[in-house]
Amino acid sequence: MPTINQLIRKGREQVVYKSTAPALKECPQKRGVCTRVYTTTPKKPNSALRKVARVRLTNGIEVTSYIPGIGHNLQEHSVVLVRGGRVKDLPGVRYHIVRGALDSAGVQNRNRGRSKYGTKRPKK
């Protein structure tokens, strides 16, 4: 435990918070334009073709972001909304595209967890 004198001389060191999504610059989401839409394979124990997009954000930073859900309508020059959130089995993918916002359509025929995939409520 430090003495009063030591605290006066040095003070307490502030804990520096490191952002998990630095390209968003402390914003909850950012708009961007898709520069490339492609599929990639995950890390070792898993096997799939994961849909990802390279997105140039409005602040000029280019990031790789994941396209969640089954099927998508994105192509080059699509305007998308990007949020933070990494994909554990895709190295370098630290962002998600928000479905149902801007040019990204919601997932078709989805009944559960609709809000996460931008799907409207089905008609009775």
UniProtKB/Swiss-Prot annotation:
One of its GO terms (cellular component) is small ribosomal subunit. Residues 104-124 are annotated as: Disordered. Disulfide bonds: none annotated. Pfam families: Ribosom_S12_S23. CDD domains: Ribosomal_S12. It comes from the Bacteria. One of its GO terms (biological process) is translation. GO terms for molecular function: rRNA binding; structural constituent of ribosome; tRNA binding. Transmembrane segments: none annotated. Residues 111-124 have a biased composition (Basic residues). Keywords: Methylation, Ribonucleoprotein, Ribosomal protein, RNA-binding, rRNA-binding, tRNA-binding. The modification 3-methylthioaspartic acid is found at D89. InterPro entries: NA-bd_OB-fold, Ribosomal_uS12, Ribosomal_uS12_bac. Belongs to the universal ribosomal protein uS12 family. PANTHER family: 30S RIBOSOMAL PROTEIN S12 FAMILY MEMBER. Part of the 30S ribosomal subunit. Contacts proteins S8 and S17. May interact with IF1 in the 30S initiation complex. With S4 and S5 plays an important role in translational accuracy. This is Small ribosomal subunit protein uS12.
